[in-house]
């Protein structure tokens, strides 16, 4: 085997897994459907499925009991999906940590990685769309991504009916 063949094989395997996940997500979006795991089991199982498909290992900590309001579940799922996808595509990270907790009438999300940082709301449509969606629901989103030090994305989404109707 030529030098570096094992590393290349691992990278190709990761790329194939990532592309398969993206194609599945695109199919669901094109049909206007939520991921099956989200519709059937709620946020925890859906994020578990997302983590298993990720090209970068995901340490998942979900502190949510029962179902959240649909708007909050969908927004939380897509916020995590966007952050994990960006990590896999741009960060050169070796790990991602996803923390989700619902308490005090809000859901808190934190997605952090050990990548190269440099993420910015001004670059690319994914983060801009995510920011717009979170703010349209009355939520808050913060991005800390200094070059060379990884990225931390914090999202707070309200669970009350008034903010949900802002959609």
Predicted regions and their residues:
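Coiled-coil dimerization/phosphotransfer module
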Residues: 1-167
């Amino acid at each position: 085997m030529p030098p570096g063949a094992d590393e290349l094989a691992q990278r190709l395997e990761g790329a194939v897994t990532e592309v398969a996940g993206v194609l599945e997500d695109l199919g669901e979006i094109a049909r206007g459907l939520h991921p099956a795991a989200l519709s059937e089991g709620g946020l925890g199982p859906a994020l578990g499925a997302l983590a298993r498909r990720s090209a970068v290992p995901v340490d998942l900590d979900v502190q949510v009991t029962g179902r959240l309001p649909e708007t909050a579940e969908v927004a939380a799922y897509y916020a995590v999906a966007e952050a994990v996808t960006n990590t896999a595509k741009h960060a050169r990270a070796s790990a991602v940590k996803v923390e989700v907790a619902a308490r005090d009438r809000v859901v808190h999300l934190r997605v952090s990685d050990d990548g190269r940082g440099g993420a910015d709301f001004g670059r690319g449509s994914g983060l801009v769309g995510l920011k717009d969606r979170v703010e349209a629901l009355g939520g808050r989103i913060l991005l800390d991504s200094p070059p060379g030090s990884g990225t931390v994305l914090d999202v707070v989404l309200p669970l009350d009916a008034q903010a949900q109707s802002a959609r």
